[in-house]
Amino acid sequence: MLLYFEKIQSFTTAHPCENVTVDGAQFRYILNGKTDGKTLVFLNGGMNTLGMWMDYVDGLSDVCRVLLFDYPQELRTNQELVVGMHAFFQKFGIKDPIFIGASDGGMVAQIYTQKYPDEVGGLILISTGGMDANTLKSLKRKYRFAPLMLWYLKRCNYEKMKPKLIKLGMSHIRNESAEEVAYAQDMFDTIFRDYQQEKDVHISGLLADLMNQIPVTASDFAAVQGKILLILPNQDFFSGKMQEDLIKLMHDPKIVYVSGGHLSTVLKADDYVRTIRNFLSEMSE
């Protein structure tokens, strides 16, 4: 198993990022795969790093067009983000995207679907919770100090804080192999080496803003009935109750329970790609 640093170097050489400005927001993105296929849009988790999806690109680009992008720092709220995404998709002629959203990216997918319910081709939600009233209430309790933490993040010595943030990321390890633990450690070390304070402030602001959203309801997802895949680890950051509430929101979802924790999206990417390919094949039947 190659380490993250080695893999991301090869990936960025094979798939260089491009930049485009849409309505004042700069999108850093990779667009690859079948030009005449359905478009899979990958929505990043809490570090807003498109590199988290690198193992998914070659594994899925032969059957679909794939779009990866970082959330633009000009878009400061989740409502601004989904409106900006909509304009971004229109620029490239992307219609009815199938969202693959992990962790907080799964929540962004729900907000987008709530706003544009008839313009979503499917939902693949991984290691995430629902944007329902119960989950938002639980998250508000869990993150009641988020405004204070955000204030501190803007003013702290960020370089000195990085080791603590890496340790926090590694706290999501759950019974992974020694090889997987080493990969995760190298991933966080590599990402944080050049990670900018402004980027962390931006994504942390988006995470805090999740608590300000209007809760979604089951009716928001009626238009994607039968086009929903949920991949739920049994030792995830999101509790079993949150997973149950997510399931209740969805219409006729396919549910795949997997062994692992919150980092399984990256550490078990090959297994997840196979699951996604099977689901896409079933959707096409």
What name fits each language-model region?
Residues 1-38, 63-64, 95, 281-285:
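Alpha/beta-hydrolase fold catalytic core
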Residues 25-75:
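Conserved HGGG/HGGXW glycine-rich cap/lid loop of the alpha/beta-hydrolase fold
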Residues 58-59, 223-260:
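Conserved loop-alpha-helix segment in the C-terminal half of the alpha/beta-hydrolase fold
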Residues 67-104:
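Active-site loop/oxyanion-hole signature of alpha/beta-hydrolase fold enzymes
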Residues 106-117, 123:
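Short glycine-enriched nucleophile-adjacent loop
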Residues 114, 123-155:
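Flexible "cap/lid" loop of the alpha/beta hydrolase fold
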Residues 134-136, 156-222:
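Conserved alpha/beta-hydrolase catalytic His-Asp/Glu region
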Residues 260-273:
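Catalytic histidine-centered segment of alpha/beta-hydrolase-like enzymes
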